[in-house]
């Protein structure tokens, strides 16, 4: 399988990984500022926005996968004649 088929959902974890790296860096410099980031990340606005983005990104990923399957089927049936 190509890298796109094998790892196509792994990119969804990138925002969480970036947030974790930022938290670790800030927490090493100032534990108080790190705690502030934790408190902010647990507010309803931030968690609601995060959940919305995850839900919509997952929906778009599924739609993109379905589109790729349709294109593949079209390619095999109409262009190559299988």
Swiss-Prot record:
Found in egg yolk and in plasma. The keyword Protein biosynthesis does not apply. Keywords: Storage protein, VLDL. Pfam families: Apo-VLDL-II. One of its GO terms (molecular function) is nutrient reservoir activity. GO terms for cellular component: chylomicron; very-low-density lipoprotein particle. It comes from the Eukaryota. The keyword Transcription does not apply. GO terms for biological process: lipid metabolic process. Protein component of the very low density lipoprotein (VLDL) of egg-laying females. Potent lipoprotein lipase inhibitor, preventing the loss of triglycerides from VLDL on their way from the liver to the growing oocytes. Belongs to the apovitellenin family. Monomer. This is Apovitellenin-1.
């Amino acid at each position: 399988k190509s890298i796109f088929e094998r790892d196509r959902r792994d990119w969804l974890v990138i925002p969480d990984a970036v947030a974790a790296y930022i938290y670790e860096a800030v927490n090493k410099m100032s534990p108080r500022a790190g705690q502030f980031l934790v408190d902010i990340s647990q507010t309803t606005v931030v968690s609601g926005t995060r959940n919305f983005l995850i839900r919509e990104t997952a929906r778009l990923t599924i739609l993109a996968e379905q589109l790729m399957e349709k294109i593949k089927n079209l390619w095999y049936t109409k262009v190559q004649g299988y």
